[in-house]
Amino acid sequence: MNVFWFLPTHGDGRYLGTAEGARPVTLPYLRQIAQAADDLGYHGVLVPTGRSCEDAWAVASAMIPLTQRLRFLVAVRPGVVSPTWAARMASTVDRLSDGRLLVNVVTGGDPAESEGDGVFLKHDDRYVVTDEFLGIWRRVMAGETVDFTGQHLRVKGAKILFPPLQAPHPPLYFGGSSPAAHGLAARHVDVYLTWGEPPAAVAEKIADVRRRAAAEQRTVRFGIRLHVIVRETSEAAWAAANDLIRHLDDSTIAAAQQAFGRLDSEGQRRMAALHKGRRDALEVSPNLWAGVGLVRGGAGTALVGDAETVARRMKEYAELGIETFILSGYPHLEEAYRVAELLFPRLPVERRTAGVSPNLTGPFGEIIANDIVPHRSQS
């Protein structure tokens, strides 16, 4: 099991939908989160993309020299940049990070944002662009010189001179809920990502992508994007969930849902359908809470509960085939520690910390009464 954390380049805070308790995005703050994730043994961090965020590639490049082993899942936007240019970017970051780049392919689900970036295409046409883009990108990254003429993209003599460290290219991650997205995942990507839907819905998506990948004679791994609200007791966790949305009023929720309504993302539609813009029935599956999605686009659900319960829910997703968990929590610095401390001991996490010598076996924790070495409880 690989567990990722999240760099909140669109802002952070203690509450949703308000400036109360908010934190600005600064280099020192992002550095704290990245270094905490590195020291705690997270596999990597997701760096989000979109006009609501700082640029993902610039942020990842700033964090790389400040970390030792942390991987960076960074978005590339087909149609916004050329596949050859994107290949150069990816190869350079992979080389300079000593092979710590992972590439998140984002087709985009906001027509207004896409048009602002110069992309005037309908939903399925954007997936055609992404398909052509990845066909070129993968070949260029593998060292080929590519001539290609497609429906939307054309290159002649496309190549890069500095190859990536990870051959044939850094792993490709991708999420999407439409049939077009599933077909593209089957043809091109290494890891298919889903937002945190109830297990039965996730199982259906996994089965469909697996079936399509088998028809392409490929295999695909699977991951899930979730928020987490974990505490030592269930009561404390649910109190924290309610506290997260304590400042939300009906007008803020309605404005957010109206904004989401103009998107043509099937994944966003499915997120909104879980809560229907109402705050009175947010537990949409055992311990799966849709409160985040009242005002946050994209991943809108959180696993809520005590550590044993949340770990059990994660293992249930793992039994469906999920290997990668991309988690987050508010505020992201404190919750990076809480999630690692409460969940990692209860999960089969592939964990290699950067800040602890492999020869350092203890003691861990403050010495008791100046004489007694503390031990972890067996409960």
From Swiss-Prot:
It comes from the Bacteria. It holds the Pfam family Bac_luciferase. Gene3D superfamilies: Luciferase-like domain. It catalyses: an alkanesulfonate + FMNH2 + O2 = an aldehyde + FMN + sulfite + H2O + 2 H(+). GO terms for biological process: alkanesulfonate catabolic process. Its EC number is 1.14.14.5. Keywords: Flavoprotein, FMN, Monooxygenase, Oxidoreductase. GO terms for molecular function: alkanesulfonate monooxygenase activity. Belongs to the SsuD family. Catalyzes the desulfonation of aliphatic sulfonates. NCBIfam families: alk_sulf_monoox, PRK00719.1. This is Alkanesulfonate monooxygenase. It comes from Sorangium cellulosum (strain So ce56) (Polyangium cellulosum (strain So ce56)). The gene is ssuD.
